[in-house]
């Protein structure tokens, strides 16, 4: 998958017709994510493209903690393989806030090892925008050699990302 063909977020659209407008308009707000899933996909795409400014600006300030732009730039910087969205929803809470969550696996290769960030991410809608707040990490089972590859190439894992 190349950026010219498909957006890294897995939408099957071109980057220009998908996450690019969100990335370019993060400061102006001219175009913002319309759902927690769209924000999560655009954040994954930003990680792939090393657009760490977008990551910081779409992370709710109350949940940033000590995370900085410089820390993100320093790495680690894995080779991102694919994003798999497992579930997404949004709902209005009793206090009136609109919240959502997205469960996903973001597969990557780092130092020759394949692993995934398997997370249930939480989001909040404030001031006309969705923001990432926090996530609950889970353990991702690595695919077997004969399982379909995590990158959705249609090949077996052993014939694709396992050997890259």
Curated annotation (Swiss-Prot):
Transmembrane segments: none annotated. It comes from the Bacteria. Pfam families: SEC-C, YchJ_M-like. Belongs to the UPF0225 family. HAMAP family: UPF0225. This is UPF0225 protein SO_2497. The lineage of its organism: Bacteria, Pseudomonadati, Pseudomonadota, Gammaproteobacteria, Alteromonadales.
């Amino acid at each position: 998958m190349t950026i010219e063909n498909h957006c890294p977020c897995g939408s099957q659209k071109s980057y220009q017709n998908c996450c690019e407008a969100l990335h370019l308009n993060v400061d102006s707000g001219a175009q913002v994510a319309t759902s927690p899933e769209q924000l999560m996909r655009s954040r994954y795409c930003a990680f792939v493209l090393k657009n760490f400014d977008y990551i910081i600006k779409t992370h709710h300030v109350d949940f940033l903690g000590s995370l900085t732009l410089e820390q993100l730039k320093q790495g680690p910087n894995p080779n991102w393989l694919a994003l798999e969205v497992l579930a997404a929803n949004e709902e209005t809470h009793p206090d009136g806030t609109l919240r959502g969550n997205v469960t996903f696996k973001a597969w990557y290769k780092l130092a020759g090892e394949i692993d995934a960030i398997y997370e249930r991410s939480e989001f909040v809608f404030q001031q006309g925008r969705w923001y990432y707040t926090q996530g609950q990490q889970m353990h991702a089972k690595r695919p077997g050699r004969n399982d379909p590859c995590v990158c959705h190439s249609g090949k077996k894992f052993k014939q694709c990302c396992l050997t890259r």
